[in-house]
Amino acid sequence: MKISVVMATYNGGKYLREQLDTIRLQTQSVDELIICDDCSGDDTVGIAERYISEYGLQESWRVIVNEQNMGYADNFNKVTLMASGDYIFFADQDDLWLPDKVEKMVAVMEEHEDCVVLCTDYEPMYDGIDASHAPRKIMDKMPDNNLLEKITLSPGSVYIGALGCCMCVRRNFYHEISPYWFDGWAQDDRMWRLAQCAEGCYLLHSNLVRHRIHGNNTATYGKYHTVEKRVKLFTAMQNADQAMKKMLEDRGKWKESVMMEKHNRMMEHRIRLIRDRHFAGCIPLLGYLGYYQKVKSYLVEIGIAVKKK
């Protein structure tokens, strides 16, 4: 059994060394760490290379630098495809791993052979006055009680319920789902969704990551209150819906495929409402309320459309 960690970096020098310490000092050692830097303008690459040299990790840890900026999602996909481990852990450049993160997660995946993606809870760590705080409803879903939950595909489970830095994926599954990839699809959303299509998405309710939240995070809370950002989000979700639908059809899961088609149609109605002020779509959207992540979004988006000039 081989364990890989992959990290996509960009201007992450401020916190990188702390994160590398928590990976190096795991109770179950990792066999490989690949860092892929996306043309950072700071000393991220230098910090990583000096760290590897300082601890004599050249045989198992390495740094790759992109010739041109690829963007977060594509860079993460690139580095993950390079990993050779049976289990692949995603690492952000600015978090802290608890010492037994790898040991606990590998033990669960070894015990549950159907688990293709394992997620965990996390503890938020706020950095700076501009850091967005995790909503109470999110924190309430992370009881840190060490219970294992299997995520079953449903209209509500489509919406991502874990962070990429809290995920581990089987390498064979990652390569198996490569045909469903599209440019720009973030690895956390892709793993969460497609693992459910394979009936292998699990969530371990144990805080194994101290997730640093600051103004430069790729994922922040409450940031989709403009038409442009919401349309971009919904369009990406439509692309993900189509990928799920194709995977489900390839596996002969027709009932679930129909569900994803309905989810996709709902997103189209929501886009037309806020982008085109298509208020006639409010009526059919009532039939899709069960597919919303939050029902109050229905009223919020009507308000956005009303205010749009």
Map each language-model feature to its residues.
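Short loop->beta transition adjacent to catalytic acidic/histidine clusters or analogous donor-positioning motifs
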Residues: K2-S4, R24-I35, D43, E59-R62
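Short, well-formed alpha-helical segments that are part of the catalytic scaffolds
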Residues: G12-L25
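A conserved acidic beta->alpha catalytic loop
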Residues: D37-I47, Q68
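Flexible acidic/His/Gly-enriched loops in nucleotide-sugar-dependent glycosyltransferase catalytic domains
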Residues: L57, D74, K104-V108, H112-F173
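Glycine-rich, basic loop-to-helix element that forms the pyrophosphate-binding segment
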Residues: V65-A83
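Conserved nucleotide-sugar donor-binding catalytic segment
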Residues: L81, P143-Y224
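Short aromatic/hydrophobic "clamp" motif used to bind/position activated sugar donors
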Residues: I88
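C-terminal subregions of glycosyltransferases and related glycan-biosynthesis enzymes
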Residues: L153-S157, W185-A186, C197, C201, ...
